Amino acid sequence: MIRLAIVMLALAVPASTVRAQEKFQNSPDARVLGDFKVRVEKYDQLRKKADDSAPPLKESKDAGKIKDAQQGLAERIGAARVGVKQGEIFTPEIAQVFRRLLRPEAKEKETRQALQEDKPEVASFKVNGPYPDKEPVTTMTPNVLQALPALPKDIEYRFIRKNLILRDARANLIIDYMTNAIP
């Protein structure tokens, strides 16, 4: 019985993801969301090139070595993205669509609770900068993830207060962000 439940859950997650992505393809916002996808994929390719140019990282449980490798990757990405500014991926048009997609999700109790977790003082952050150490890596609720376009591996959405962050988890780098993503 448990095995059946696990199989059903495994089958349901990809199906719901596929349905969510089909929703975007058939929406009036398909062009704008397609532009977002192209911008994210362009970043992903840049990161892969930066990653390929580094010596291979040997598997390690040493937090210092892992952090050094992460910082090295972030530095190579930063060098390839010199002069990048906020809004390169979340253009005004894309941000407008995302705010509309997030508006109903922000009203959900689960989303509100997740955003209230561990509210330390506001940390500063910037594009091409590290995700702030003082900020919790906020768990994204399933309803929010389903409302937004899927992302490539190791690129994730996060919230810092009302700001939606596009984070490179491998480099611990803020790729871009949009302010006041939720009301």
Question: Which residues are covered by each model-predicted region?
Answer:
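Mid-length scaffold segments of soluble, non-membrane domains
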Residues: 70-140
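Sec/Tat signal peptide C-region and signal peptidase I cleavage site
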Residues: 16-20
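Bacterial N-terminal signal peptides
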Residues: 5-14
